[in-house]
């Protein structure tokens, strides 16, 4: 490990790996550090990503894909199942990934482009001089080493300690942190090409249960619950255990993971002097679904593109890096995050009668272009009483602006 690089990337997830790859491909010296001993492990993700969004960056390798998803089912609190066939779910179909394989391949791409990689290496303290980040003190195997860099990328996930240590307020209110638990299960009767989502305040208050297939009779079965709704006996794992007991009593659990997903608005600013923040660290996971793979890839690559130009000009100040922040906010990603946050704020307050009405009404719709925006607009049109509630929350006028 050298003592000086053009770029230091803190975090080896998709955002950090794609940023490192982009910088390295442009000829800059890059060090990517990952605090865990292995890239991609442990997995803390449902592993789903939209097909069109993934293809924006590359054609997935076969070894990345656990299952190709052709349709989605949404199950209401009363048990009614709405099936979205491929012709309706076109914008929502995609892949369930093997994240361990996918993440490692992304880091290998970065290494192949010339980036140095160090695992089990923690950035424990940023080097701050005159209000600017100048690198970090890294701890590897109990040995501390100072590594200086002209530009640092904070890609350290939802915890995002590094950005906070650099003076960026990354605090997430409890009500805007989805607490999650997930089993990898086998021996369960599922549709291997359909995702399923269960909603309801007795099933997953402030969130939902998901079933993401990963092969024959195998799936990620997980839950997200609003952080402010967790109580003794009603933790995410408690809700999940009850769900599994009802639906998969003979299933076998292979793995358990737990973690958190921010469902808040993005950070007010994702750059500082010599610092760029990407992926979950920037709070760009989807506040409605919790998905974050696409956002990590997009912001990681964009950081590499904008940051490279700033380095070339010899100016990595906040102002020089601001095009990164402005570009992603003006993009499809930024607009979707804004819209979905407002939708989430309304939907977490709906009772089960409202949720039943929504799922039943959607099942009767003929949506030739199914996506979140069209879905919500059609729900409002089909449910006059619900439209009044959503209108009072300001959601209808927001949707009309998109």
Curated annotation (Swiss-Prot):
Taxonomy of the source species: Archaea, Methanobacteriati, Methanobacteriota, Stenosarchaea group, Methanomicrobia
Recorded catalytic activity of this chain's protein: a 2,3-bis-O-phytanyl-sn-glycerol 1-phospholipid + 8 oxidized 2[4Fe-4S]-[ferredoxin] = a 2,3-bis-O-(geranylgeranyl)-sn-glycerol 1-phospholipid + 8 reduced 2[4Fe-4S]-[ferredoxin] + 16 H(+); 2,3-bis-O-(phytanyl)-sn-glycerol 1-phosphate + 8 oxidized 2[4Fe-4S]-[ferredoxin] = 2,3-bis-O-(geranylgeranyl)-sn-glycerol 1-phosphate + 8 reduced 2[4Fe-4S]-[ferredoxin] + 16 H(+); a 2,3-bis-O-phytanyl-sn-glycerol 1-phospholipid + 8 A = a 2,3-bis-O-(geranylgeranyl)-sn-glycerol 1-phospholipid + 8 AH2; CDP-2,3-bis-O-(geranylgeranyl)-sn-glycerol + 8 AH2 = CDP-2,3-bis-O-(phytanyl)-sn-glycerol + 8 A
Keyword set includes Transmembrane: no
MF term (GO), any: geranylgeranyl reductase activity
InterPro entries: DGGGPL_reductase (IPR023590), FAD/NAD-bd_sf (IPR036188), Geranylgeranyl_Rdtase_fam (IPR011777), Geranylgeranyl_reductase (IPR050407), GGR_cat (IPR054715)
EC number: 1.3.7.11
GO biological process: glycerophospholipid biosynthetic process; membrane lipid biosynthetic process
Protein name: Digeranylgeranylglycerophospholipid reductase
Protein's UniProt keywords contain Metal-binding: no
Pathway: Membrane lipid metabolism; glycerophospholipid metabolism
Requisite cofactors: FAD
SUPFAM superfamilies attached to this UniProt entry: FAD/NAD(P)-binding domain
Gene3D superfamilies in the record: D-Amino Acid Oxidase, subunit A, domain 2 (3.30.9.10), FAD/NAD(P)-binding domain (3.50.50.60)
Known role: Is involved in the reduction of 2,3-digeranylgeranylglycerophospholipids (unsaturated archaeols) into 2,3-diphytanylglycerophospholipids (saturated archaeols) in the biosynthesis of archaeal membrane lipids. Catalyzes the formation of archaetidic acid (2,3-di-O-phytanyl-sn-glyceryl phosphate) from 2,3-di-O-geranylgeranylglyceryl phosphate (DGGGP) via the hydrogenation of each double bond of the isoprenoid chains.
Keywords for this protein: FAD, Flavoprotein, Lipid biosynthesis, Lipid metabolism, Oxidoreductase, Phospholipid biosynthesis, Phospholipid metabolism
GO cellular component: membrane
HAMAP family hit by this protein: DGGGPL_reductase
UniProt: FAD binding residues: 15, 34, 45-46, 48, 99, 123, 280, 292-293
Organism in which the protein naturally occurs: Methanospirillum hungatei JF-1 (strain ATCC 27890 / DSM 864 / NBRC 100397 / JF-1)
Similarity comment: Belongs to the geranylgeranyl reductase family. DGGGPL reductase subfamily.
Other observations noted: Reduction reaction proceeds via syn addition of hydrogen for double bonds.
Binding note for cofactor: Binds 1 FAD per subunit.
């Amino acid at each position: 490990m050298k003592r000086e690089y053009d770029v230091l990337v803190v975090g080896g997830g998709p955002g950090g790996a794609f940023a490192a790859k982009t910088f390295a491909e442009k000829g800059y010296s890059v060090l990517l550090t990952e605090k865990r001993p292995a890239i991609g492990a442990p997995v803390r993700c449902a592993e789903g990503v939209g097909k069109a969004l993934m293809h924006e960056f590359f054609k997935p390798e076969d070894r990345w894909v656990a299952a190709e998803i052709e349709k989605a089912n949404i199950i209401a609190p009363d048990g009614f199942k709405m099936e979205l066939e491929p012709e309706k779910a076109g914008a929502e179909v995609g892949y369930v990934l093997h994240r361990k394989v996918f993440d490692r391949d992304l880091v290998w791409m970065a290494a192949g482009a010339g980036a140095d990689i160090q695992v089990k290496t923690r950035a424990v303290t940023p080097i701050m001089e005159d209000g600017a980040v100048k690198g970090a003190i890294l701890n590897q195997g109990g040995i501390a080493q100072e590594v200086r860099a002209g530009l640092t990328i904070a890609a350290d996930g939802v915890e995002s300690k590094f950005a906070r240590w650099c003076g960026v307020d990354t605090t997430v209110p409890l009500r805007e942190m989805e607490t999650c638990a997930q089993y990898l299960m086998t021996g369960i009767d599922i549709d291997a090409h359909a995702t399923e989502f269960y909603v309801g305040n007795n099933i997953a208050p402030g969130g939902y249960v998901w079933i993401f297939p990963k092969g024959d009779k195998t799936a990620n079965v997980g839950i997200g619950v609003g952080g402010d709704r967790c109580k003794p006996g009603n933790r995410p794992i408690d809700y999940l255990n009850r769900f599994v007991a009802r639906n998969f009593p003979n299933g076998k659990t292979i793995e358990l993971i737990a973690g958190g997903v921010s469902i808040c608005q993005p950070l007010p600013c994702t750059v500082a002097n010599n610092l760029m923040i990407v992926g979950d660290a920037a709070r760009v996971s989807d506040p409605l679904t919790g998905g974050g793979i696409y956002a990590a890839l997009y912001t990681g690559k964009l950081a590499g593109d904008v940051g490279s130009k700033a380095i070339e000009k010899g100016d990595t100040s906040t102002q020089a890096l601001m095009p990164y922040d402005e570009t992603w906010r003006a993009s499809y990603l930024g607009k979707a995050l804004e819209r979905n946050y407002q939708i989430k704020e309304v939907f977490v307050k709906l009772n089960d009668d409202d949720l039943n009405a929504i799922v039943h009404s959607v099942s009767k719709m003929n949506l030739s272009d199914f996506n979140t925006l069209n879905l919500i607009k059609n729900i409002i049109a089909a449910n006059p009483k619900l439209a009044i509630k959503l209108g009072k929350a300001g959601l209808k006028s927001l949707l009309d602006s998109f």
